[in-house]
A protein has these predicted regions:
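S-adenosyl-L-methionine
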Residues: 1-43, 82-110
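Conserved SAM-binding motif I beta-strand of class I
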Residues: 70-75
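A short SAM/SAH-binding and catalytic strip from SAM-dependent methyltransferases
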Residues: 113-127
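C-terminal substrate-binding/active-site "lid" region of AdoMet-derived donor-dependent transferases
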Residues: 124-176
């Protein structure tokens, strides 16, 4: 019984840490995912990284639409990660190109990513911008939902009725 309580405490603490450091788990709405997927132009073999992937809903949507694209997500909140791992196990043939990792989004190197998703709270942007310096390929697209990155001009802004705005940046802004 004590093991169960310790396990639950660890899961809750990981959720609290994720919420305080970047964002609480809040899955992207299906309509928001569809709108964004309709804009993506991915080629076989390209790589998508989701920093703060939660339950992987965005990665699984990308994998369904682009089955030849490699999708990797990072998060530190255990409950959504367990859901993502379970989904991957249940549908392993469909999601063989999806990789879900326990890891701090601020410590990931995105040099090999063609697209980097950042769907977080704006309060973490200063730390995020510092952590991504030199870790994003110049030709990558960095896709940010809801709030623009401070003091940076997006290459493109996507707006649709009833959906959160999406800001698309090029990786060159992280090179300086």
């Amino acid at each position: 019984m004590i093991v169960l309580w310790i396990f639950l405490l660890v899961v809750l603490l990981s959720a609290a840490l994720a919420g305080l450091s970047a964002a609480p788990w809040l899955p992207t709405l299906p309509s928001q995912r569809k709108h964004l997927l309709d804009q993506l132009k991915l080629q076989p073999g390209q790589t998508v990284v989701d920093l703060g992937c939660g339950d992987g809903s965005m990665l699984f949507a990308v994998a369904r639409r682009f089955p030849e694209v490699i999708c990797t997500g990072y998060d530190i909140s255990l409950l959504p990660l367990f859901i993502a791992w379970g989904r991957k196990l249940l549908f392993f043939k469909t999601y063989k190109n999806v990789h879900i990792r326990f890891g701090d989004l601020f410590k990931q190197d995105c040099q090999n990513a063609n697209i980097v998703f950042i769907f977080l709270l704006s309060k973490c942007y200063p730390k995020l911008l510092t952590s991504l310096k030199g870790k994003v390929a110049p030709n990558a697209q960095v896709i940010v939902e809801a709030w623009p990155l401070p003091n940076l001009e997006p290459q493109e802004t996507l707006k649709a009725e009833g959906l959160l705005p999406v800001y698309i940046y090029t990786g060159t802004i992280f090179r300086a």
